[in-house]
Design a protein with these regions (language model features):
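Conserved alpha/beta cores of soluble small-molecule-handling proteins
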Residues: 1-169, 174-176, 204, 214-283
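Glycine- and Gly-Pro-enriched alpha-helical subdomains that act as flexible
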Residues: 176-199, 205
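Secondary-structure junction motif
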Residues: 208-210
Length: 283
């Protein structure tokens, strides 16, 4: 037997999980999702993720399927039933089921699915040595602030980057980096400023980004929220990206150009340690 998953009110073996043919998440990508990191059995930044889930649902006019305490209990139950120590817990809320039509009945009831994934999140080779990211045009729609399940643009960009020998990809629009395909992009200038995009409809508001920003403020580190070009990124002193599944990930090559000496820099190392310490994990 595989994992225990949550589908529309029931905990069932993954082999028995069923999602309706006419679910709008399946037919239209009319759904939102969240992924929360789990380290040593504890959810990390989950309050930020659930707040973002509520915001995304509100932007699409989809009702929250359960109260926040009930969602937290659901997540904890998935972690417990699957004996998850390190990995992620995934939530997916679709608008619901109805016969296929672009217009939907206002009476639809949202559908909630949840599952866990085992994954080593700390001390990985990539976190020790850094990754190389490609640069490509941003193929996505213009409401990237909503964490929608429509991810084909990101899938295509990541697949193309891998085929070119890169580990990941940063997206570019109008001559400026928007974000990573599944992460928030950051660069560090020679004078120690941490640059990252300000919140807007062009980017997803990152939960790990927000948590890290709080830590930086407490430490007196300078964060400048502004857009930067691929060229500025390639000539930065350091670079990194953040996400729930990669935490603080050093970037040592951008679009084929080495960043610094090609190794994770001291500021990035400090940020990794700060984040893990705040999460209660030995650095």
């Amino acid at each position: 037997m595989g994992r225990i998953v949550y589908v529309h009110g029931d905990f069932v073996p993954e082999e028995e999980a069923r999602i309706g043919l006419f679910d709008r998440g399946f037919l239209f990508g009319d759904a939102v999702y969240e992924v929360t990191a789990v380290i040593a059995g504890r959810m990390i930044d989950n309050d930020l993720h659930l707040a973002r889930l509520e915001r995304s649902l509100g932007e699409l006019g989809i009702a929250l399927p359960l109260s926040r305490p009930d969602i937290e209990a659901l997540q904890a139950e998935l972690i417990s039933r699957n004996r998850l120590t390190d990995g992620t817990v995934y939530l997916h809320v679709s608008r619901g089921e109805a016969d296929r039509d672009f217009l939907y009945p206002e009476t639809m009831a949202p559908k909630l699915v949840g599952f866990t994934q085992m994954k080593t999140l700390t001390g990985t080779k990539a976190q020790r040595e850094g990754i190389a990211v490609d640069l490509t045009g941003d193929p996505r729609w213009h409401r990237r602030d909503i964490k929608t399940a429509m991810l084909l643009g990101q899938v295509m960009a990541k697949q193309a980057a891998r085929a070119r020998g890169f580990d990941d990809v940063w997206l570019v629009e109008a001559g400026l980096v928007t974000e990573g395909a599944s992460s928030t992009a950051h660069v560090i200038t020679a004078d120690g400023r941490i640059l990252t995009r300000a919140a807007s409809k062009a980017t997803l508001p990152g939960c790990t980004q927000r948590a890290l920003a709080r830590l930086c403020e407490a430490e007196g580190l300078r964060i400048e929220e502004r857009a930067f070009s691929p060229e500025e990124a390639q000539h930065a002193a350091e670079a990194f990206q953040t996400s729930a599944s990669s935490l603080v990930m050093p970037v040592v090559k951008i679009g084929g150009r080495m960043i610094g000496d090609g190794r994770p820099g001291p500021m990035t190392r400090r940020l990794q340690s700060l984040y893990l310490e705040a999460a209660g994990v030995p650095a």
